[in-house]
Amino acid sequence: MKFTKMHGLGNDYIYVDAISQKIENPNEISRFVSDRHFGIGSDGLVLILPSDLADFKMRMFNSDGSEAEMCGNAIRCVGKFVYDKKMTDKSTITIETLAGIKVLEMTIENDKVVLVKVDMGEPILKAETIPVLSEKHPVIDEEITAKDYCYNFTCVSIGNPHAITYIENVEEFPLEKIGPLFEIHEKFPRKTNVEFVELIDDSTVKMRVWERGAGETLACGTGACAVLVASVLKGYVGRKATVKLLGGDLTIEWNESDNHIYMTGPATTVFEGEIDI
C-alpha cells in the first residue's frame, strides 16, 4: 500500500489514494498503521476516494479502527494531497464526508498548498442531533458528573459531537485522567470529543482535546470550531478568534451572514512510502 504521512498542527494521519489502489478492511489497516511502535505511527488513516457528489470523498478512521464523521485537520491535508499530487488543478474543491460536503479554498505557493480554509458548515446545536441527553437548547452549561469530577459543558456538533468546558490552566490539567471519563459518559449516546479551554482574551482561547477513539491529540480542527462556537454562545469571544492548540494555531470564524464556520490552518507532508498490509 502506497501512503503519505501528513499532519495538520501535529494531528497526523496516514493518507492513501484509494482511487488508484483497492483498500480492504480499512478498520484493521488503521489500527495497524497507527501503531507508533509496530506500524507507521499516526492518529489514524484517511482514504481519498471518488465521489458522485463532490470532487473527492474522504473516509477517516481513528487509531482504534473506528470510523469518524469528519476531522478538520485531516480534511486540510486531503486538499493538499490531491492538489500536490496533481489529482486536481483547482484551488477550490469540494470533499464529501460523513458530515456532509465541505468546500476547501487552498492557498498555493510554489505549486504547493501551504494553507487551507475550510467551510465547515453550520454548527449543530440541537441536543438530539449532537447527540447529548439534555433538555436544554442550545446545550449551554449542562452539569455533568463523572466519578468525583463535575463540569458544566456546552455541547456542539461540527458533524461530530463535542463537549466543551472552561478551566483556568489547560497546561497543568490532568486530561489523560479526566478526558476519558466524559468521552464515554452515558449522557453522550455516541460518545464525545471533550475540550478543556482556557480563556486568554476576547479573541484568543487555548485548548486541549481528548478525542473520541484517539485520546489526546496535538490538534483537533472540528474541536477548535466547536470551541469557538461555545465561546461565542457564552459571550467570551467575538465571532473570529485564534484557537491555540498544542500543535499550533487555527483561525476560526463563525460567519453571521451564512451561519457557517470557517477554519483556516496549515497542512504539511511528512514523508511518503509503501507498506505491506
Curated annotation (Swiss-Prot):
InterPro entries named in the record: DAP_epimerase_AS, DAP_epimerase_DapF
Pfam families reported for this sequence: DAP_epimerase
UniProt pathway: Amino-acid biosynthesis; L-lysine biosynthesis via DAP pathway; DL-2,6-diaminopimelate from LL-2,6-diaminopimelate: step 1/1
PROSITE patterns per UniProt: DAP_EPIMERASE
Keyword line: Amino-acid biosynthesis, Cytoplasm, Isomerase, Lysine biosynthesis
Subunit structure, interactors included: Homodimer.
Job description of the protein: Catalyzes the stereoinversion of LL-2,6-diaminopimelate (L,L-DAP) to meso-diaminopimelate (meso-DAP), a precursor of L-lysine.
Name of this chain's protein: Diaminopimelate epimerase
Organism, as annotated: Methanococcus maripaludis (strain C6 / ATCC BAA-1332)
